[in-house]
Amino acid sequence: LPTSVLATALAKVLAERTMAQCVGRGLFRYASRPLRTTGTWRTPRLCLTLRTLPDGNLISDTHAASELDWPEFHNGVASALEIGTAHVDSSWIFAHASASRGGRARHAGFLLGLGLHGHLRRLGRVHAYRYLAPRHVLTTVGLVLGLGASFLGTGDAAARQVMAVQVAAFLPPGSVPLHMSTMTQAAGLLGMGLVFCQTDHAWTAMRLASQLDAPMVDTADANEAHRDAYAHSAGLALGLVYLGRARRTSMSSSADHALLERLCRAVATPLGEASGMAVARTAAASALALALLCLRSGRRDVAEALAPPTPANLAHIRPDLLLVRSLARALVLGDAS
């Protein structure tokens, strides 16, 4: 192959390696850099340009701009995680907003990272809605999940309102449809689960359970776009609301029995490719919900529902479903002592 072709291929590989380093960088440097709130926090953009030797040529544009959105998002998360103990206010956070495409993606991740530190508790409502108004998907995802992490398990009314506006299923009957993207609504569902984590909030759990097998989602996307993310977010959120409930309580009420029966029935339904994407999607989401709801409870009835009926049926279960069910079963039967 020509040298130029090999160099371009190498540049693409090195660029992908650079993009993948962001998550590890955030963990390695967690809370390691001091912050002066009188200045701004610099998040360097991803440098994917390669210089070849000995001719010194520069190779860039190995990836389209759209392919860099999520890597820049994770770059922003990693940068925020490096912040040490500090007190930041709403104006300081909003001052870091950027108008460029890469800058917006980085700042969206920066919001999520600040939320993981708990700093978004201080984000004013006016600034929050100024972030949401442009309907930039990554910014909304970062803000909603960051708020969920900052208000974890508090049931905060203001945070709940921000989540509910993103999800059509949580709007009051007769509301004007907002046509949010499916990814935005998936983030809203998961954010709702974080805000109400381990609160056993029955109404929220009921709304989340209804989205596990929702046939249609009021969205600006094509109906099937990101539907797996939407269903899985609903399952995780439902499990978070009832986190460890089977271990903390006897789950003897009729509502608890009905929920467990519904989830177990959904998990056990699909066998093989002919079962359809929608059924398989619901099964995976239900398994995730069961894993968190019955976390370390030792419930044998739930574990049996998650396991294949016979070893022969292993050949008839999709590999991704088998992975989720095996993981869920292990979490249910984990040491509950």
Regions found by a protein language model. Name each.
Residues 1-285, 289-337:
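Alpha-solenoid helical-repeat scaffolds
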